[in-house]
């Protein structure tokens, strides 16, 4: 086992903060409408130019092990915020840096880190409550477009295309992002359906880049029981193989010998097949299988209606233009079902919604309507070069996550204003002792950081702007894009509540861990110089022995 360095107390925390600052300083230059670009080196090909905070954070790995630990902890803040809310990574990083910087002063002054942490937690809980109170539901297409634009670094075209996509497939609909073929971004709406079940074995994957199985023009077999015996399936497999088309099997379960045989046939290239578990449970599973049958123009093979697997013909199978099966979900695009049958099915489910007694049942039935009627929207991102395409695609994905978050939990005023208003509303939080009070105070000071950074990146004087915004009320804030003050929501500067909330909670969580750190253990650096000097000496000795032998 390699030797370890153990560093304690102030020195450990100081080195960790150095790492935090290096990462946060690189990430925060991208914040706000006048944020700058960061260029990332690639081992081959052109470098990547980005304004996406989490992309910058993911690239950073520091040489000094202790600094690197600090940097990695803040990187965790960015990626966790990105995973949950899809945006707000730069805000989260700026907040984490500010809380750590303020907190370290108190720790150095001899305050109890555990009480500081309790104070921080109290402040964050109060601020999150205030954010939820201030939150406003997103209802109009215009608001959705504004959220998308802000998240895509003030690109209005991206906001508009996402709002159009949501208009077409509904807020619950499925929206995917692909590389386009032209200079302009385009929106395609495809009749389709998504359900939350993925492939039963990773050996079915035929697109390693997307880690998914893609079937073009496949047959779809729907069965409401388990398949464990391959003999039951053989007649169907032979017919499909003769037709030379792929097959998607959706059943309660495919296991044992049946699954093994399907995997072997796929690996040998004899048959392109993917097996997926049927979505839902109990009666809901049967209903969802019927939905898929309606969409693909097939039948559910069920023993209760006198059908069995051995007697299946190609006419009983559904078909679709394309099916994508990922690890956790399956998208059926352009099923061959008749439009009038799908309409009738949707009407039938809508009647059930009206008759439903529980909220849970109603919600599940509404999901089914969205899946049947909604379809899949595909945003094709257009750009002049591949470098621009990658950067733009990342921004579109960010914006899509942000708009979903806005639909889920509503919106608050953007540009760092919501946090300042929450601070004013939560001004009366009390701690149990002086150290907890200090923890509360440091959070209330740190939440000015996002606005300060936005102003700094726009070339303004941060303190002047913060004071002016604090003097205002409601959604009054600073628009850094054109250096004006006014109502942020009217100016279209919005943030999803979920993004602001997640950024604050994750930043405070990791910052608290850093403040309560007392020791760090890292691998000791290897002594390169000593080892290098020994080798030539040894070799020289051997040469001498040869001379003696002569």
From Swiss-Prot:
Metal-binding keyword on record: no
Question: Is Transport one of the keywords UniProt gives this record?
Answer: no
List of residues binding ATP: 30-33, 51, 87-91, 415, 479-481, 495
The GO biological-process annotations, alphabetized, read as: protein refolding
The listed locations are: Cytoplasm
GO CC terms, sorted = cytoplasm
Query: One GO molecular-function annotation for this sequence?
Result: ATP-dependent protein folding chaperone
- Chief subcellular location equals cytoplasm
Supply the EC number(s).
Answer: 5.6.1.7
Q: What class of enzyme is it?
A: isomerase
Reactions catalysed, semicolon-separated, are: ATP + H2O + a folded polypeptide = ADP + phosphate + an unfolded polypeptide
Q: Which SUPFAM superfamilies match?
A: GroEL apical domain-like, GroEL equatorial domain-like, GroEL-intermediate domain like
Which InterPro entries does the annotation name? Answer: Chaperonin_Cpn60_CS, Cpn60/GroEL, Cpn60/GroEL/TCP-1, GroEL-like_apical_dom_sf, GROEL-like_equatorial_sf, TCP-1-like_intermed_sf
To which protein family does this belong?
A: Belongs to the chaperonin (HSP60) family.
Q: Which HAMAP family match?
A: CH60
Query: Main role?
Result: Together with its co-chaperonin GroES, plays an essential role in assisting protein folding. The GroEL-GroES system forms a nano-cage that allows encapsulation of the non-native substrate proteins and provides a physical environment optimized to promote and accelerate protein folding.
Protein name per its UniProtKB record: Chaperonin GroEL
Q: Tell me the lineage of the source organism.
A: Bacteria, Pseudomonadati, Pseudomonadota, Betaproteobacteria, Burkholderiales
Which gene carries the instructions for this protein? groEL
